[in-house]
Amino acid sequence: MANGTLPPDSRYSRLDHGSLIPVEQINFPNIPGVTGPEGIFNTRFLYYRGPKYDTDDLSGVIAVEPPIPLLEYPSLVPQIDADGNDIDGLRSHILRAPLGTYTGWNVRAAGFSQGDACDLTGSYIPFAVTKAERLANGDPRLSLQERYTNTAGYTAAVTAAVNRLVSERLMLASDAAGAISNATAWFTQASGGMLQ
């Protein structure tokens, strides 16, 4: 709390909002050349390790080895939109005016442990620049051209997103101009300068 003003409410995925779901219900878009998150989540169990072992504080004597699984913890993940981006949580201006799919996970490429989760590394999967490119690639996500038309359209979208964040007290007004400028530069780079 600063100057008697409470911070904005917390924002996170929740079961009662339908924004936190069992992992098997995730519906990641079928992006060509991209492996979805299916099968890369760790299953966790509560184990029985014997009568002298305390599972609450992980102390005591392990008398049962291998341990006996008692129950499987549910694997829950954030719900995603049609682009594959999380729908809840603190959505920055980059998620509110996206240039691609942003994930908190990544899958290992060819070589060591191919197809396994790549720990602590997220992904950025850019949108196609034009509708023709999107259709040729079979990408279900709208292209930059279809979303924003051109740089001015993107700048308008990201400006609206930044203004909403400022009004929601999730971004400082003094950071707005820099956020818009940086995002517009990223759009120019992502579009290869083709959508002026």
Give the predicted meaning of each segment.
Residues M1-Q196:
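C-terminal His-loop and adjacent cap/lid subdomain of alpha/beta-hydrolase
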